[in-house]
Amino acid sequence: MLQDQLREIRTQLRMAMNGITSTSMREKGIIYKLNFGVPLPEIKQIAATHEPGSELAAALWKEDIREFKILASMLQPADDFPFDQAKQWVKEIPYLEIAEQCSRNLFCKLPYVDNLLLGLIFNVEDEYARTVAYLIWAELFKEGKTVVAPVRAAFIVECMRSIAWPDFGATWKEKQAAVKAMKFYGRQSADHARQMLSGFDEFPEFMETPEGQEIYNDLKFEFEYYS
């Protein structure tokens, strides 16, 4: 049964494959054992033809195939995904696209999302841990959801650590994810927007840099536009 499902998915992906996209991704350094280059809307359509299940999702995830990993995030039931398995998936994320899809399709829906966020944001060992935390926050805030006080406090402090601490060494993708989450948080209310912008007051040296000015002005424009 499982092998039949995997064969059917491979067939569906071959029929939808886009060689130009997969070649372009490979040229940009995104290298999988197999990449069909299938666009996300079509991957969603394929996912809709299969029953979600942990066994199928696990089998898809373990393969070094771009579309399999994305489908795994779509087909894994959130209520049957242990905490340790979530942490393991984060360790195994190969590229930003997979981090984004896991955060959007699965991680933000987990019943223990607050605990997962605290574990990820203080994890500096795994390449994508902090980035995934910000991506999850972005999804939650975009939907107008709130998080418990300790998680919110960690979010506010760690955003500025990622963005403004020169010695922290945050990656570009981590900074971008942090800014994205800050935008959705600030959109929720005027108080939230002020919280985000006031954080820059503690980093006057960063505010004198072109990067600091660009991020601050980007956030300010965002909050004024949505106010």
Task: Cite the ranges covered by each PLM segment.
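Alpha-helical scaffold domains
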Residues: 1-227
